[in-house]
Amino acid sequence: MKLTPEMLTGKSREHLVNLPTTHSSNHFLQTQAVQAFQALQQSAAKNGFNLQPASSFRDFERQQLIWNSKFKGERKVHDDAGKALDLNQLDDWQKCQAILRWSALLRLVVIIGERKWIFLILIFCHEVNLYNWSLGNMKKAATSLN
């Protein structure tokens, strides 16, 4: 399927399917990404991990709401160490930089059609065993997307 500008900017969901999970029915991915994620989940389960999605596709309106809430200080924005920032101390450009510190990569994943979502696992792997397991399975999972 050729991705349209509407798909790439979160204005359309026609290229997405629901990712069934036990915790939420609000995760949407492209068909190939669902298949790859489910294969990764099965592999993780065999190795003792309960791998669940933390985030997935967000439409434009939802992403705009999140951005605006952060910019206005209604939602927390964190520094590199994960400590909440006082946005009242920042000018508008600094606020944008602070928000993008944790948001840019996630939005980029949606923009490029979610074909690279698998690499996000490295960002969220704070446990050494899960990190090592994910490194070992990255190439295999990425290959299944092709």
From Swiss-Prot:
Top-rank taxon: Bacteria
InterPro entries for this protein: Bact_PeptidoProc_Enz (IPR052179), Hedgehog_sig/DD-Pept_Zn-bd_sf (IPR009045), Pept_M15B (IPR003709)
GO terms of molecular function: peptidase activity
A Pfam family: VanY
Any single GO BP term: proteolysis
PANTHER family: D-ALANYL-D-ALANINE CARBOXYPEPTIDASE (PTHR34385), PEPTIDOGLYCAN L-ALANYL-D-GLUTAMATE ENDOPEPTIDASE CWLK (PTHR34385:SF1)
Name used for this protein in its record: Uncharacterized protein HI_0101
Organism field: Haemophilus influenzae (strain ATCC 51907 / DSM 11121 / KW20 / Rd)
Lineage: Bacteria, Pseudomonadati, Pseudomonadota, Gammaproteobacteria, Pasteurellales
